[in-house]
Regions:
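Residues within helix-turn-helix
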Residues: 28, 131, 142
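Structural recognition of an alpha-helix C-terminal capping motif at a helix-to-coil junction
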Residues: 32-39, 52-64
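Arg/Lys-rich amphipathic alpha helix in sigma70-family domain 2
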Residues: 46-49, 60-81, 97-98
């Protein structure tokens, strides 16, 4: 059982860290969330390994750990920095402008309420359907659509309605 868990972690750790980084907007917090999740998963690995999609289950555990962390640390200021967005976005003539737009988008994403941020990450980073997001967040598909709609509206409003070099929907793709 231990060897199968070690193989799972070796094959999927980078992907799980990228997912957690997109959720948290903080690479250090992402490492903490993944570490806590994998510790819990290791104790339950016999049951998890028998599931049809163990990686999806562990990803849901990461989502839940992130949501729980946000509840526990509601007043903590989250640093909006993750390397997965470095190379994303429409090329601009001025690299400084590109980085400023990227940083502004990161800050807007980091400021979203936790469930809206999770819904946005699951939709645009993990390419999940409404049903998959609803299952991960423990809500209905209609609520997922509402979370995504509100998040996109908030992101657009925070941008002053301008459609600049980094479109909202490309920030996590």
């Amino acid at each position: 059982v231990r060897d199968r868990f070690d193989d799972f972690v070796a094959q999927r750790l980078d992907r799980l860290l990228r997912y957690a980084t997109a959720l948290t907007c903080d690479p250090h917090l992402a490492q903490d969330v993944v570490q806590e999740t994998l510790l819990r998963a290791q104790h339950r690995w016999e049951r998890i390994a028998g599931l049809q999609a163990p990686e999806s289950y562990v990803r849901k555990m990461i989502t839940n750990e992130f949501l729980s962390w946000r509840r526990r640390k509601a007043s903590r200021n989250v640093t909006a920095a993750h390397s997965t967005l470095d190379a994303i976005g429409t090329p601009t003539a001025d690299h400084a402008e590109h980085y400023a737009e990227r940083d502004a988008m990161r800050a807007r994403i980091a400021a979203l309420p936790r469930k809206q941020r999770a819904a946005i990450v699951l939709r645009f980073y993990e390419d999940c359907t409404d049903a998959e997001i609803a299952e991960a967040l423990g809500c209905s598909a209609g609520t997922v659509r509402s979370h995504i709609s509100r998040a996109l509206s908030t992101l657009r409003a925070a941008d002053g309605g301008r459609r600049r070099g980094l479109p909202v929907t490309e920030a996590l793709s």
